[in-house]
Amino acid sequence: MCIRDRHIARTLIDRGFNYHVTEPGPGGSDLFTARFGNIYSARQLLQLARRCYGLFQPQDVAWTRPDGRFVDPFRPQIEPDGYASEQAVAQALPPHLAAVRRMFEESHLFIFTVGLTEIWESTVDGAVFPVAPGVVALPPDPSRYRFVNMSVAEVRADLAEFIGLVRQHNPDLKILLTVSPVPLVATYEDRHVLQATTYSKSALRAAVDEICRHHAAVDYFPSYEIITSWHNGGAYFEADLRSVAESGVAHVMRVFERHYLRTVDRPAARQDAALRAEFARASKILCDEEALDTGR
């Protein structure tokens, strides 16, 4: 989740649907359903589900920021001020995972945007992180991590395992997948970032397509195609050719509403201006990947 899912959530709120929040942020902020931060890869999503059901316990608990504060390496920017100690990071984890578990078990529809095939993982236990070690904080031993660029088969397998796991606990759960149209800001591979972006988006789109063909409870929403298709000549990107313009977001949400919210018994649109304003304010949170730009 980084930009697409927030706009979908805001549209659902505006139309009176229940955007299910199991772990509110400070001041009641509902930017994330639970406070997991941005999730970019299928592997990261799968591991979060496995962790909340006690199937995986990574050895990494806390990393250290340059200012001496500590962060949860799996959601490094969820607490802007960081934590005072490693123990504080560990103590915040059980209630968080319980909230994630409730999210999976109490939801009717789960919407997820896959954004990256490039991941950083621990060589000790395979744990995957949203940003590379050192971008936001440093682990005790930086040599125990490696870069991996996932294949179509690996993304497909991770998504399939995730779907099987969460629907085992919530058989009625439906899943809507999208692919992020936002290009990579950088790549660790020895090739141009344009090549890396083309591979990543192609692999994700192919994997998601195969998943949807084999899972009746899963659908695909083409926000990627709407934003990046040649027919609009790049008009849906800002001047940096990376950020999605408001006109593109509006087009995506019109299509989403037309095809997914058109029901005769849907709740009346909520006229809660304060709620919409708070969601818009909270949505300005820095994406983890954009932290790569802050050090340049």
Question: How should these model regions be labeled?
Answer:
Residues 1-3:
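Short, small-residue-biased leader/transition segments that mark boundaries at the very start
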Residues 73-296:
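Alpha-helical cap/lid subdomain in secreted, periplasmic
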Residues 47-90:
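A basic- and aromatic-enriched beta-loop-alpha substructure that forms the phosphate/nucleotide-
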Residues 15-40:
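Active-site-surrounding "flap" and adjacent substrate/cofactor-binding loops of secreted or lumenal enzymes
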Residues 35, 42-50, 252:
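Short, Φ-rich (hydrophobic/aromatic) sequence segments
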